[in-house]
Amino acid sequence: NVHTLTPAWMMSFGDEKQRGQESQALVYDGIIYVTASYSRIFAMDARTGEKLWTYSHRLPEGIRPCCDVVNRGAAIFGDKVFFGTLDAGIVALDRITGKVVWKKRFEDYKAGYTMTGAPTLIKDQRTGKVLLIHGSSGDEFGVVGKLFARDPDTGEEVWMRPFVEGHMGRLDGEESTPTGGSREPKTWPRDENGELVEAWHHGGGAPWQSASFDMETNTIIIGAGNPAPWNTWKRTAKGDDPRNWDNLYTSGQVGVDPSTGEVKWFYQHTPNDAWDFSGNNELVLFEYQDGGKTVKATGHADRNGFFYVVDREDGDFIRGFPFVDGITWATHIDPDTGRPV
């Protein structure tokens, strides 16, 4: 009886601000919450479409969104609704009144940082704490991608984890550990003077999409974006083969400990990504039986044209296969190494 459906109501997101619309609406307790372009959010009566409140974030001059002024969604916890802003901020609003409860700016928007992805609420299975998880955007402008955990009541940062090898993380306001375990990255080259190439200082790897959470293994699982800059020779030793420089931890999927922000595991879909394939598309958690054993896995359809199945307990590659025709950058994924050929 689909042919009998008719519109009950409709609304416009508004005049000159009606730009790209990429948000997934939330419906909670009879209210629809939906974000829109230019860092706006609307609350509407689900039955009548009546606009209950609107919050329009005051954006400064100099914001640098790469790919239109979009927002990809909000999250709800308790009496608050959370969403990111194009000036590298995140805002908590009272979900009934739309009044600001708190707002935080996590990085410098003039450097190219923004936030477009929907945040995620998780409960750390070890500590019992509820955490607000969000990433940064801005790979195209050469920023270091970062994942954050916050106290949803106050907005205070709990930890921050950069997704470029050798960059330092934070825990409880103090430096914690470098990503990859060392300040001497092995997958980023050095120049003729023995210094890390300029590209490393920017790096990319932004986790701009929403995270998944595996309660059983207590792991945040999220995609890491493309390395920066796009120019692969900037991320490769002079005269060398790009395939020798993977540029970790970009263009892959990352398992993160919610208690500490430490990287538990990483699998890279596209080493030294030169095509902006990124690795941010959603990671679906599922289980299947293999020889009587239950395998806990992630499923990921990457923009590089291959579908990946990865063990979500340790990040080990299980299988990868093409799901589109006309792939030219690689012939297949090596079944033993998990690397493109």
Task: Report the location of each language-model feature.
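Extracytoplasmic beta-rich repeat domains
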Residues: 10-26, 54-75, 103-121, 141, ...
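Short coil/turn segments that connect the beta-strands within blades of beta-propeller domains
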Residues: 29-31, 78-79, 124, 129-130, ...
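Residue position within the beta-strands of beta-propeller blades
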Residues: 32-34, 83, 132-135, 222, ...
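Short glycine/acidic-enriched loop and turn motifs that connect beta-strands
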Residues: 39-40, 89, 138-142, 227-230
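Short loop/turn segments that connect beta-strands within beta-propeller blades
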Residues: 45-48, 94-97, 152-154, 258-260, ...
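Short, solvent-exposed loop/turn segments at conserved positions within beta-propeller repeat blades
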Residues: 86, 140-143, 238-249, 300-303
